[in-house]
Amino acid sequence: MKTKLDFLKMKESEEPIVMLTAYDYPAAKLAEQAGVDMILVGDSLGMVVLGLDSTVGVTVADMIHHTKAVKRGAPNTFIVTDMPFMSYHLSKEDTLKNAAAIVQESGADALKLEGGEGVFESIRALTLGGIPVVSHLGLTPQSVGVLGGYKVQGKDEQSAKKLIEDSIKCEEAGAMMLVLECVPAELTAKIAETLSIPVIGIGAGVKADGQVLVYHDIIGHGVERTPKFVKQYTRIDETIETAISGYVQDVRHRAFPEQKHSFQMNQTVLDGLYGGK
């Protein structure tokens, strides 16, 4: 399993870091087999797995439950788990309690915290407590209401400077890595050049030190809309629907199960039970 030091070396050698989300055992197993460097158990599971409208309804218990499954499927991959909405905002004590629960119960290797101003102290507290932290700036889904929707961040001079400043402060607070979401490629390049920690992009251009995408987006599974920044490599929904439709039709017409799918009783036993009928 790669470690924090390995990711720093990858940045130094300009070897792109590959991160992918996973929310369950089979997805994690496939991700590890395919060779991803890191798995993110994102609170995006609220929308892509649980059918919620946003990430706001996801709980600490949800994150623990799904991370456990991912850990079983990818025991040799570095796993980052999101701290969900309001689990690190109320107090330092509350933040540490929630973080400890996630790490101890799920086996996560690091925790991801969204936001800059107001979150630096949480980053520092977790780092001092021995819990590696991945920061997340730009479009932060937990704060989408405050940001005015799912929009590109840092497009004007003032907000761009703020993102650079917050990125530096995240590193100074102890973050081992930074995720930038929906940020202009030029700004990402500047931030990646400025920081000594790896910068992982999602909708942030090719100059980031690595990339992360949502598992369901890249395989075309259960997604109604594909964001501009996503490259969809296949659409398994079509294959799945075809298979289920075939099953429905076979059952309706008694074409399934066939004899090869059934179990047979010994004739002697059958005779004893029903007189051979």
From Swiss-Prot:
Binds 1 Mg(2+) ion per subunit. InterPro entries: Pantoate_hydroxy_MeTrfase, Pyrv/PenolPyrv_kinase-like_dom, Pyrv_kinase-like_dom_sf. It holds the Pfam family Pantoate_transf. Mg(2+) binds at D43, D82, E114. Pathway: Cofactor biosynthesis; (R)-pantothenate biosynthesis; (R)-pantoate from 3-methyl-2-oxobutanoate: step 1/2. GO terms for molecular function: 3-methyl-2-oxobutanoate hydroxymethyltransferase activity; magnesium ion binding. Coiled coil: none annotated. One of its GO terms (biological process) is pantothenate biosynthetic process. The active site is at E181. Homodecamer; pentamer of dimers. Belongs to the PanB family. NCBIfam families: panB (TIGR00222), PRK00311.1 (NF001452). Catalyzes the reversible reaction in which hydroxymethyl group from 5,10-methylenetetrahydrofolate is transferred onto alpha-ketoisovalerate to form ketopantoate. This is 3-methyl-2-oxobutanoate hydroxymethyltransferase. It comes from Bacillus subtilis (strain 168).
